[in-house]
Amino acid sequence: MTEKKILIAGTELKSFKAVANGANREWALHFCRTVAKMTGIYIELSESEALFGANVMFDATEMMYSKGSVKIERGNIIFRGSYHSLPIIIEKYLEKAIEADGDEIDLTESEEFDLCDTPKLYTKEELMKVLEYVYETPDLLIVGDEVDNSRSMPSSMLRKYFDASGTYPAIMGMDLGRCGLKLPTLPDNERHLLSRCVCEIVDYVAQGGIITFGCHFTNPHKDYERSAAAGNQDRGHIGGADAWKDLVTEGTEINKPFKRELTLDADFLSALRDNGVPVIWRPLHEMNGGWFWFSPIQGEEYGVVKNAIPDLWKYIYNYFTERGLDNLLWEYSPNNSNGANPANDVLYSYPGDEYVDMVGIDWYTVGNYEIGGSGRSYEKIMTLGKVANLAEFGQGGPLHGATRDAQEKLFTCKHVDAILDRMYADGYKIGYAMSYAERNSFVWWPHCDEFMASDRIVDLSGMPALFEKIREN
């Protein structure tokens, strides 16, 4: 290969160094390999920026799947793009040198890129029709899993699911408060994770996959003592009726931190909207349980606060509507009723039909395969006349096995099948069922492969046919 003389701002490309600090190391290595392959020029890596230019730097925080740029600033080359677009932009930038005539090429000009390769995704309306079709079709069920409560990316859960079952889930759940996407606390050097998450979601939805998001909102009360314990941010109480009124009143002391979190969450959901991704959004889940601060049950001191959740739900709904988040399907998903308090009832906090697109139950069994109380709760939400789902599904604490061998004796996917058999026999309808990560996951329970191979189960490979079916009708 004949080496061309490639100039950027008067400096030869071979004199540049690729800055490989932190998360950018992946991109720096990719750049060096690509340059060597395409031009025969070998670029050195550097752990830090040179003071006087000739750095190649990378910014993978772009939230638009197909967009990015190359900027020449103060003698440096800066590649900006998404997790998807950045490697492609690097190649396209270098292609100009390969395709240009002559032995000396000047690549100093900055350039904006729109690769125009964002996949065409289904619409929110089409998603709703698919769920309605499955809901009305006996013994047909969309299933999937929640991404675990760490900084795991969608691809991590998808790999685990495939390894356990030989197939991919048709629905995937994530949480803005617990999966590494807690925007208020995400440091700048990790914001590339947001771009990666968006791009992986786009790729998943392009195959027909369904994405759901919730949020374990942080307790906004100034006196709530938080510990280092995982998940502690969503516990405690905020007070009586006055505190709840202040929570939905702009500019109050308790409203400000909540609105700040809500704004950042809306920013992320807006990025999904801008990429064409419909989202099942289920805020304030399990509000009737009393274990999260976002509950009408506010402990012995304050008792039950009537209309706490309906008012908060409408506040979130109105704000997200103002933000133009028209890609959301709103799902009301209480816990299965488990107490004598009237506020434990699954319908107690229902905000009204005009604020809800579908409903669900978070259902954790303790080994009784009769339908029992959970079934009665499911019957209640079915009376609302909307698509109903097992929004979260898992086994209770006594059924958690320390190993897979131990789990075999406690709770397996065969038990899940038995529960579903009984539900369908009793006339229940279900749109989707989503297990809840880690040891509450289909992939943790033995016999997942047999479960996913059942005729009733729709996995990711079956989703395109469902969308085609509803488009034909």
Segments and roles (model prediction):
Residues 172-174, 346-369:
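Aromatic- and acid-rich polysaccharide-binding/catalytic face
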Residues 144-146, 282-285, 313-344, 387-398, ...:
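Aromatic-lined carbohydrate-recognition surfaces of secreted/lumenal glycan-active proteins
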Residues 41, 137-141, 167-170, 206-211, ...:
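Loop/turn elements at helix/coil->beta-strand transitions in domains of secreted/extracellular proteins
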Residues 1-113:
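Solvent-exposed alpha-helical segments and adjacent loops
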Residues 184-325:
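Substrate-binding cleft of extracellular glycoside hydrolase catalytic domains
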Residues 153-161, 195-198, 267, 334-351, ...:
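Alpha-helical scaffolding within the catalytic cores
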